[in-house]
């Protein structure tokens, strides 16, 4: 993490593992975290709002953003494009704010290239059977789509070792507590504290790096 920069957190999970619910609950607890809102070409799900959950754009508009190099990362998932606009993240971290990205493993790899100290947090379901039940309970996808997501889940879960932390979302309140603890621990790292409390460190004669 460079001077005057905030932490970048990446929450990664297969579809149906509870990633979005955990992120929403975390932001309710800690509104100081800046949520990076991704652009996507997929249709909104029930209850989703443009500009809050995603920037819903056409395929043509998305590809134009990509060609203009305005995306920090992008990927094609289940036939739809997803991408992260770079401007807001760069501005937030430069101002010392922590940024959180809901992202897939492909995107997480690309973010790591830009922010090597970005912290990956992988959310796992307690079992494939539980994942299947959650996908069905959402009532948003056909059986064919659910089958496709389950097939993809195995490949996505194989990338869990690329993350620094893993949370098994068996019981929601416990998973949320663990996610909150990861955020807190990252903020207490020496590199973070040295930036956030630079004046105190200087008064105490503590070097800014070690």
Curated annotation (Swiss-Prot):
Pfam families: Guanylate_kin. ATP binds at residues 13-20. GO terms for molecular function: ATP binding; guanylate kinase activity. Keywords: ATP-binding, Cytoplasm, Kinase, Nucleotide-binding, Transferase. InterPro entries: GK/Ca_channel_bsu (IPR008145), Guanylate_kin-like_dom (IPR008144), Guanylate_kinase (IPR017665), Guanylate_kinase_CS (IPR020590), P-loop_NTPase (IPR027417). Residues 6-184 form the Guanylate kinase-like domain. Its main location: cytoplasm. Its EC number is 2.7.4.8. It is found in: Cytoplasm. It catalyses: GMP + ATP = GDP + ADP. GO terms for cellular component: cytosol. Essential for recycling GMP and indirectly, cGMP. Belongs to the guanylate kinase family. This is Guanylate kinase. The gene is gmk.
